[in-house]
């Protein structure tokens, strides 16, 4: 599996290197050519099905296998619901539901939810990249039973205020069509899964920050010497490197 992970990581790296840049992050629109090209390449390469069972058309990899891919995506600052789709398809796969060939986003923060026939209503909070996905996967509790529900996007979207580049939305939904709804298996801890994925993303971002610091200090000169030659700068870089290493331990 290690060789397979290395190959997949190389494919992912090439796609992100080719398509993700500062222009994409600044002017990200669902109908833009740059976004559609990136999305098509990711979907067609089936990178979003890495955690899907083989009998459902996926690669059958484990969560541990995709850690380098989650880190790589964060290092590029990939501004799309790429990892969210991987996790959503994993949850669908665990419920023996075929994965989606489109971007999906997800949340487990819900309020005032109601289900009537095949429709769902409620307030769904802190949904990443909802502007770039047409479907939402939620973990929620209805009548003392936890469910995983996939439904089509609709209703009122409200962009949250945050200091990060990742756009998150609150959704006020009324009678949206349910695509799939299954009882959540007890062995699946969605909250813990999302927290761990976020931690891995944070570590990947910190690695990129460290790399940028080293590159900057190696190129910028003061008093005829690069900053990396100064003892104080070296000490600071070492401290940052230790913090990054500790975070990834």
Briefly describe each language-model feature range.
Residues 3, 23-34, 186-194, 211-242:
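Glycine-rich cofactor-pocket loops
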Residues 1-82, 203:
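Amphipathic, small/basic residue-rich leader segments at the start of a protein or domain
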Residues 10-13, 211, 242-245:
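Solvent-exposed alpha-helix faces
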Residues 16-23, 73-77, 95-96, 210, ...:
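Structural signal for hydrophobic packing residues in well-ordered secondary-structure cores
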Residues 78-95:
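N-terminal glycine-rich flavin-associated loop
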